[in-house]
């Protein structure tokens, strides 16, 4: 049975990917900031889904990802689907900083942790959902 970890699974593409994997013979670990949304998804298939609240902008995100991997029984595929994008016509620094914390620092935390897990365990698949908004405005 494949073990899939999805960070950013409480909405959007991450949630839809989790729903697709529910139809397969996989064990799924899902993470996101909204605990209530995680619990709603887990209620659909409590025998197949493990949950762990993770805010990728926080320093404990890496420890929480490792907890989720352990709960799920390991990891064969990691999908990072967390990210934000806001129009910031006035270039307010707080909006830019929050975006960078999520899309750069959070990305780095999660991908580094997943990569190192795979390196220690003989491989796996690392996948991310990103955007070209930075080049297209």
Regions found by a protein language model. Give the residues of each.
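Residue(s) in the substrate-gating loop at a strand-loop-helix junction
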Residues: 131
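Short alpha-helical oligomerization interface
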Residues: 89-101
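Hydrophobic positions on the long internal alpha-helix
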Residues: 79, 110-114, 118
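Conserved glycine-rich Rossmann-like NAD(P)H-binding loop of the short-chain dehydrogenase/reductase
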Residues: 26-40
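Conserved NAD(P)H cofactor-binding loop of Rossmann-fold oxidoreductase domains
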Residues: 81-87
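Conserved glycine-rich cofactor-binding loop
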Residues: 10-11
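Rossmann-fold cofactor-recognition segment
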Residues: 45-60
């Amino acid at each position: 049975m494949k073990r899939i970890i999805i960070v950013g699974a409480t909405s959007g593409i991450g949630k839809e990917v989790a729903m697709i994997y529910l139809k397969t013979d996989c064990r799924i670990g899902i993470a996101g900031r909204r605990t209530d949304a995680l619990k709603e998804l887990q209620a659909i298939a409590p025998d197949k889904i493990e949950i762990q609240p993770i805010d990728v902008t926080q320093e404990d995100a890496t420890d929480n990802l490792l907890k989720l991997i352990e709960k799920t029984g390991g990891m064969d595929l990691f999908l990072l689907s967390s990210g934000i994008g806001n129009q910031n016509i006035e270039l307010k620094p707080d909006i830019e900083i929050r975006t960078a914390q999520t899309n750069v620092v959070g990305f780095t935390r999660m991908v580094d942790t997943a990569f190192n897990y795979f390196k220690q365990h003989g491989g796996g698949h690392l996948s991310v959902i990103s955007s070209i908004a930075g080049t297209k405005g």
